[in-house]
């Protein structure tokens, strides 16, 4: 099972150039608003048409500009969950799901598939409820049932938690993740939330200004984002220009320091990143004097902002985030950073 996408589309001054392959499991398109994530889904679904390129699902060509192939949405076997779920407000749960079976002529088969989907999505007993009578999570399950009753080969989710209150999201992430694991085919999900991407996906494709920069296994991306946009999207707070001065050494002019790295530094280095949790009071490597400029308290964590002794005046302070339980009685005069925790970011 595989999805192959290589598409190009000009939209005024914006240009979409996306090329990737996805296999069984959940692949997340992660990027800022307006980077082309949702438009990519619409091209795959057949709602929008690229200017050129190729889209293939499990060996079947959905779109090919050179061969003049452009299957209509209903023939692509692609399920698309919109941000607002697009349920019919005047229809019951039963009626909404049956809309997905409008091409099934056998009444007994319709009822069998409906009952199967109601059980799978834990909607039994809600058949005669209308969307307004359902919780946000129940509405999402109805929308998914309407899609999955058609047995799509690819399921696409566009910001699946954006319509939900914040306090519902964590429990519904677990529910949806379990459902997607039972789906058994490719899933493509769009989000701008790094937490959702990390929780839900096995792979992440990073998008920036219409381009797909990289696609990696989820944990690998957070461990080694490789570029400034990917580091920003994965939540790295400390990103600063740097240059290579040795095989495993970089200079950071804005901070007035040199750092030893665990990875070999390649040519084309643009910056380094250090996650706010990575600073350490005990580490002796890459240890330099610091002065503290700001302290901010969160419910469970403490954020300290500091500057290195040789740091330039116009460079922003550096973030250190630690558990409130680990707050030192006196802040240390110097902090270290393990060479393994230096993220090398390339052009």
What do the predicted segments below correspond to?
Residues 42-43, 203:
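The short alpha-helix immediately C-terminal to the Walker A/P-loop
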Residues 5-27, 32, 38-39, 46-49, ...:
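Non-catalytic connector elements of ABC transporters
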Residues 48-49, 56, 102:
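A position-specific signal in ABC ATPase nucleotide-binding domains
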Residues 223-246, 273:
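C-terminal boundary and immediately downstream tail of ABC-type ATPase nucleotide-binding domains
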Residues 54-76:
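ABC ATPase NBD Q-loop/coupling interface
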Residues 77-79, 83, 87-229:
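ABC ATPase nucleotide-binding domains
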